[in-house]
Swiss-Prot record:
Organism this protein belongs to: Burkholderia ambifaria (strain MC40-6)
Highest rank taxon of the organism: Bacteria
Subunit structure: Interacts with MinD and FtsZ.
Protein's name according to its UniProt entry: Probable septum site-determining protein MinC
Gene Ontology terms: biological process: cell morphogenesis; division septum assembly; regulation of cell division; regulation of cell septum assembly
């Protein structure tokens, strides 16, 4: 093999962070029912996120059909990219998904049943609909039905805000943070994470932002990601985003 550097591509070692979907049961019917139930209220919460299937919490001798779990995750618009398993779970490599090495250091090889559990996607979704804001970190805050929710603190990576009415954000939304509203979203600061308005099909919802640098924007399920770069005349600028004939329209805002 030639070691000459190619001007067209490059292979390098690297790492990519993903969500872990931790399987704690072999009852796939119950798992499917719970997964659908959790995603009904916020179907876009983890839409298009990559996820690794973590089977380390299963008891010795237990196994699941990973192909079925893969399909479940696809059905809720998540993208399984691999499996995290213990060395004794050789069957995990039979599903056609690569075996991944988790870096969370939360499962002890000697006594996995006593280890702190790895992140669970289903638990994270539950937080989107049931949790009270926690001081450190505060993963989710939810407004009362129909009321405007005002957030005046910066949102860090991994934090999520859900508003049942309109949402007003007065501080930066960092990469990896997510703001979701059933109504309009107003962001008077840089948006570098995700903003999803009109999540229950409100096509009249809009997003207003004074500095647009997003990972994802969405209205009523119609979304745009950074895979489709924003034009220079709106990137980092004040804009409004609305729907017109099922297309996202991003228009400059004249603030003076």
């Amino acid at each position: 093999m030639s070691l000459k550097k190619s001007p067209f591509f490059e292979l390098r070692s690297g790492s990519v962070d993903t969500l872990l979907f931790t399987v704690k049961t072999t009852d796939l019917d119950a798992l499917r029912t719970e997964l659908v139930k959790r995603f009904e209220a916020t179907p876009e919460f983890f839409a298009d996120d990559v996820v690794a299937i973590d089977v380390r919490r299963l008891a010795d001798g237990e196994r699941v059909e990973l192909a079925d779990i893969r399909q479940m995750l696809n059905d809720v618009r998540m993208r399984p990219v691999g499996v995290v398993a213990l060395a004794t779970q050789g069957w995990a490599g039979e599903a056609g998904l690569p075996l991944l090495e988790a870096r969370d250091r939360r499962v002890s090889a000697a006594k996995p049943d006593e280890a702190e559990p790895a992140p669970v996607v289903a638990d994270a979704v539950a937080a989107a609909t049931t949790a009270e804001p926690a001081p450190e970190p505060a993963p989710t805050q939810i407004s009362a039905g129909g009321q405007t929710l005002v957030i005046d603190r910066p949102l860090r990576s991994g934090q999520q805000i859900y508003a049942k009415g309109d949402l007003v954000v007065l501080a930066p939304v960092s990469h990896g943070a997510e703001i979701i509203a059933e109504g309009n979203i107003h962001i008077y600061a840089p948006l570098r994470g995700r903003a999803l308005a009109g999540v229950h099909g409100n096509h009249d919802a809009r997003i207003f932002c004074t500095c647009l640098e997003p990972e994802l924007i969405s209205i009523a399920g119609i979304y745009r990601t950074t895979e489709n770069p924003l034009p220079a005349d709106i990137l980092g600028k004040a804009v409004q985003i609305r729907l017109e004939e099922e297309k996202l329209m991003i228009e400059p805002l004249r603030l003076t």
